[in-house]
Regions:
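Acidic, mature catalytic/reactive cores of soluble proteins
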Residues: 1-140
Length: 140
C-alpha cells in the first residue's frame, strides 16, 4: 500500500541541512535590503563586488533585479517594502518629452539625495527600456 503524502516524505535529502542553508540565505538576503528616505526600498545587486571599483553600481537598487525580490517579499507579507519600491520607482519615472514614462535602470540614495540611473552608468550599459518592461510584470 502506498504511503500517505506528507511534506517529510517529499524531502529529497532529509539530512542535507536544508533548513540551515535556507536560514543562511535569508540572512544574506536581509543584508541586501537598503533604505531610501528611512524606509527599506529594495535589494542591492551585490553586497560587495570583488573588484571594489567605485565606478560600478552594484550597490544600487536595479528595477529589473528587484521584480522577483518584490514578488518574494509579497509572499512574506512585507508589503511596506513593496509599496516603497513602487512609490520610489514611480517618482523617478521620466517626465521629459523624449523619454516620458521610462523607468530608471537603478537608483540609490547618496547623502540624502535620490540618484537615478537611466542607463548612463549602469553595469553593461543596460537601457532603461529594459527596466520599463519589467514594471507590468510586478504590477500584474
Amino acid at each position: 500500500m502506498p504511503t500517505r503524502f506528507s511534506q517529510q516524505n517529499q524531502r529529497v535529502r532529509p539530512n542535507s541541512n536544508e533548513d540551515k542553508v535556507v536560514a543562511r540565505a535569508k540572512e544574506h538576503f536581509e543584508k541586501t535590503l537598503i533604505e531610501i528616505s528611512g524606509d527599506i526600498a529594495g535589494s542591492v545587486a551585490a553586497l560587495e563586488h570583488p573588484t571594489k571599483n567605485d565606478a560600478l553600481n552594484y550597490g544600487e537598487i536595479f528595477l529589473r533585479d528587484n521584480v522577483p525580490v518584490m514578488i518574494y517579499l509579497l509572499t512574506q507579507k512585507r508589503y511596506d517594502i513593496v509599496k516603497k519600491f513602487l512609490t520610489v520607482s514611480l517618482d523617478l519615472q521620466s517626465t521629459t518629452y523624449q523619454t516620458r514614462g521610462v523607468f530608471p535602470t537603478s537608483f540609490v540614495e547618496e547623502k540624502g539625495t535620490l540618484i537615478a540611473d537611466y542607463g548612463q552608468r549602469s553595469i553593461g550599459r543596460i537601457t532603461s527600456a529594459d527596466a520599463s518592461l519589467w514594471w507590468p510584470i510586478l504590477c500584474w
